[in-house]
């Protein structure tokens, strides 16, 4: 801020000049003292300059409403919404989210620095404040087949971007524990730049938590129980309570939060599909849920705003007070988080669920639009030989969780080959390398999916984003793979050799180039098509499928090299 603007702001605060905007007659939330203030709020040049009695060029009468800070999502992969940052803004701003901290490691795993820069530039077009953490593990583990590999030297120049706050979720716990050279350099570079380091401590022991804290990792969003949360807080970490489309952990972790330690907790969505964001909400859903579960409402709102701001060093966000950014919302019902108006930098950006700003986007480079290079798959490529005298090692999904279980199941075979058994809900799963056209694919078995006929497939397969499919028969699995190759990436449902619906994701096989409302409509059509497969369970099968390829979350996952035991960090045979 230059001197003259600084002088002007002080003059408005001192009431020598009228403010551009004054919110009048609302109850104003004081997140510091956790109480209500009866006062006007004056805004000038996107900044709150006063609380008290003020006159404004524009005065908004908010009688009967409450003015609360805008919400902050502390950890989100925008790519999981399947729309670009500018379109993502349209989905979350009406839900009171004014700031997000994003980790673009999905697009980085496919398109490297080119993908990260696309997200950075498009984010500048959004009304939403979008900050970035730099992907720390591309690929997630060294043996993964991703579309890019990012070393410390690749990331270091990006710290000069003002939107970059730090190093994103450090998943490679082996690299940290063994103090591997490049991982050490990534951690040290973040420290030297005085940046925050996010963690990913899924299933880690106390010993490894100590290792992570010694490495200056300050947050974790992979907590699934109250006890895990307390162990991390005890060691000085911030804990994010997560509620996404698959991982739903708020209710289980919430008992850890009390008046003494609440400042170490805040909310995140991590991975949430666009249709869920638009229908259920974002951080507003988590605040609403926490209040319903018995958390003090002031603490819930504080966790939804101030706590995340303080964790990430966003010193002018998260509160309604002089000197803070004018990012706030009016709510008609405090406990139910009924939002009527949302303001970012003092501008009305959403009202009664309608997003106000025009949307500007940038054109993706041709490299981002040509990302699916999978080989042609034949039935013999995905054949899975088994014998009738040994149990099969199977991935058992846990609905609405990212973790899985290793299950031993009696053989399901015909002529020495595995065949899917819908009666026992045991299905074939295939993961095809799609970045370099390699003849490398993992074939395994998964239980608990609930598909009775056909197959589904997606090029969103965390974190390397190869092409993953699951189905009741080989022909439909292959048809689903072919459909996504033709579409240049996306999500598809196939039954009896016919593609029932495909959502194309042409940008790196992860993002649509279409407006949010059209993507939302396509997602609804996709879920209608899912019903034709007999799926009727209470979880998102596409996101569940996509996380079965992430070999850093226990217990077992699939890689292009086969079944992988995460805890013991080794591949497993299908039968043993």
Swiss-Prot record:
InterPro entries: Adenine_deam, Adenine_deam_C, Amidohydro-rel, Metal-dep_hydrolase_composite, Metal_Hydrolase. The keyword Hydrolase applies. One of its GO terms (molecular function) is adenine deaminase activity. Keywords: Hydrolase, Manganese. It comes from the Bacteria. GO terms for biological process: adenine catabolic process. Its cofactor is Mn(2+). It is an enzyme of class 3 (hydrolase). Belongs to the metallo-dependent hydrolases superfamily. Adenine deaminase family. HAMAP family: Adenine_deamin. This is Adenine deaminase.
């Amino acid at each position: 801020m230059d001197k003259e603007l600084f002088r002007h702001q002080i003059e408005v605060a001192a009431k020598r000049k009228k403010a551009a905007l004054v919110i009048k007659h609302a109850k104003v939330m004081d997140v510091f003292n956790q109480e209500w203030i009866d006062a006007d709020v004056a805004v000038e040049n996107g900044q709150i300059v006063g609380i008290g009695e003020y006159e404004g060029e524009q005065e908004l009468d908010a009688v009967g409403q409450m003015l609360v800070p805008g919400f902050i999502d502390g950890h989100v992969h925008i790519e999981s919404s399947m729309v670009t940052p500018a379109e993502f803004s349209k989905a979350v701003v009406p839900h009171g989210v004014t700031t997000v901290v994003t980790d673009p490691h999905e697009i980085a795993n496919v398109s490297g620095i080119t993908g990260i820069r696309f997200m950075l530039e498009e984010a500048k077009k959004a009304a939403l404040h979008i900050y970035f953490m730099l992907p720390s593990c591309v690929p997630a583990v060294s043996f993964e087949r991703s579309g890019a590999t990012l070393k410390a030297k690749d990331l270091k120049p990006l710290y000069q971007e003002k939107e970059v706050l730090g190093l994103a979720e450090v998943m490679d716990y082996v690299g940290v524990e063994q103090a591997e050279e490049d991982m050490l350099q990534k951690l040290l570079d973040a420290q030297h730049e005085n940046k925050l380091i996010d963690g990913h401590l899924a299933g880690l022991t106390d010993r490894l938590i100590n290792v992570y804290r010694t490495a200056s990792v300050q947050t974790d969003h992979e907590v699934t129980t109250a006890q895990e949360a307390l162990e991390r807080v005890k060691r000085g970490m911030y804990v994010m309570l997560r509620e996404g489309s698959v991982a739903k952990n708020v209710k289980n972790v919430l008992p850890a939060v009390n008046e003494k330690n609440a400042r170490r907790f805040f909310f995140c969505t991590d991975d949430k599909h666009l249709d869920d964001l638009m229908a259920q909400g974002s951080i507003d859903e988590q605040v609403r849920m926490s209040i319903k579960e018995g958390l003090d409402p002031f603490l819930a709102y504080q966790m939804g705003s101030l706590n995340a701001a303080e964790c990430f060093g966003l010193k002018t966000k998260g509160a309604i007070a002089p000197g803070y950014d004018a990012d706030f919302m009016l709510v008609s019902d405090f406990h139910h988080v009924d939002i009527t108006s949302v303001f970012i930098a003092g501008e009305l950006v959403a009202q009664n669920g309608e997003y106000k700003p025009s949307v500007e986007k940038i054109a993706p480079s041709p490299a981002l639009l040509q990302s699916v290079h999978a080989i042609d798959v034949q039935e013999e490529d995905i054949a899975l030989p088994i014998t009738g005298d040994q149990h099969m090692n199977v991935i058992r999904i846990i609905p609405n969780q990212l973790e899985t279980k290793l299950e031993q199941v009696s053989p399901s075979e015909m002529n020495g080959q595995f065949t899917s058994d819908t009666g026992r809900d045991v299905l074939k799963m295939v993961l095809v390398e799609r970045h370099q056209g390699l003849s490398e694919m993992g074939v395994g078995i998964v239980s608990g999916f609930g598909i009775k006929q056909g197959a589904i497939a997606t090029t969103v397969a965390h974190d390397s984003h190869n092409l993953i499919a699951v189905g009741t028969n080989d022909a439909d699995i292959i048809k689903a793979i072919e459909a996504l190759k033709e579409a240049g990436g996306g999500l598809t449902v196939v039954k009896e050799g016919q593609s029932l619906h495909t959502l194309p994701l042409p940008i790196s096989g992860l993002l649509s180039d279409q407006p949010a409302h059209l993507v939302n409509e396509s997602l609804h059509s996709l879920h209608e098509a899912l019903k034709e497969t007999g799926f009727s369970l209470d979880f998102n099968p596409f996101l569940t499928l996509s996380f079965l390829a992430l070999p850093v979350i226990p217990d077992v996952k699939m890689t292009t090299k086969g079944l992988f035991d995460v805890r013991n960090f080794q591949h497993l045979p299908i039968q043993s």
